[in-house]
Amino acid sequence: LGTALLLISHDLSMAYKWCNKIAILDRGHIIETGNIKEVICNPKTDITQRLVKSGRILEGSEREIIAKRTELLKVNRLRCWHNIGFWPFNSFWLKAVNEVTFSLYQGETLGIVGPSGCGKSTLCRALTGLLPTRGGSIFFLGKNLSTINRKSLKQLRQYIQIIFQDPSACL
């Protein structure tokens, strides 16, 4: 089984060093996506322009994509909403992740980058099954994580890992 990496960070220079592709997340939406070098050189949104200006981008870090295109992770219209009102009387939904779609192929590294509070951690928790979703789908190794049984999900989880930014701070 080939590997792929999903890097979730607010540090654009680190994403540039490790990733082939990038998706810029803001208020739960992917607002810009593509080849990392193209996105960095020609940012289309204000958020991306600010991220590029805020950090030093390391040259010579572009990764070569492996020719074999096995899809390992497919996320389609994923939604993670939190009810922050007094349910059921006054529902107000915070759309932490809203209609997020991307694919990750064998040999690729995709960076999810955005400012604090934009939905990166919520997306990570949803992808690992630690947070329920409000809609959309997550396919990992061709299996829909929201519809498979507990035993199959447990077997798939051996291939999923979170590496925290500062492991000692998580204890």
Regions found by a protein language model. Name each.
Residues 15-17:
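A short, surface-exposed alpha-helical micro-motif characterized by mixed small hydrophobic
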Residues 33-34, 42:
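ABC ATPase "signature
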Residues 40-69:
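C-terminal boundary and immediately downstream tail of ABC-type ATPase nucleotide-binding domains
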Residues 113-114:
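The feature captures the beta-strand-to-loop junction immediately N-terminal to the Walker
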Residues 128:
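Helix-to-loop junction immediately C-terminal to a conserved catalytic motif
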Residues 136-144, 156:
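Conserved ABC transporter NBD signature motif
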